[in-house]
Amino acid sequence: MKEYIRLETKIKKEMSDLIYDRMLKGESKLAVIGLGYVGLPIALDFARKIKVVGFDINQKRVDMMKNNIDPSNELEAKDFEGCDILFSADINDLKDVEFYIVAVPTPIDDANLPDLTPLLGASKTVAQVL
């Protein structure tokens, strides 16, 4: 059993390394789903090294980011410079992506229970393109 686990771990690492290498060579892309105050900085940081699709369901926000404007007012226009990123609200732009990061809100209610509706919606979006 231990040998199986070691082999499985080795295979997972090799696959991760392969995907990472493909991204560094520009042969594959990463997507960040949800471009709020958490997702946008993550997307921009990755986009300084690899191709990124930044996806948000709000077209108005996407249009602002295409013009180097952060709708959350956390980042400046210069933070968008030098980034290889496609901002989109079109699910079809997620089809050629190999790695997905979901960064959507999980607000809590009065009983401190998370509302997973945004997470479930984002998961369904990703499922449509897998």
Regions found by a protein language model. Give the residues of each.
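Structural/interface elements that position substrates and couple domains in central-metabolism enzymes
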Residues: 1-130
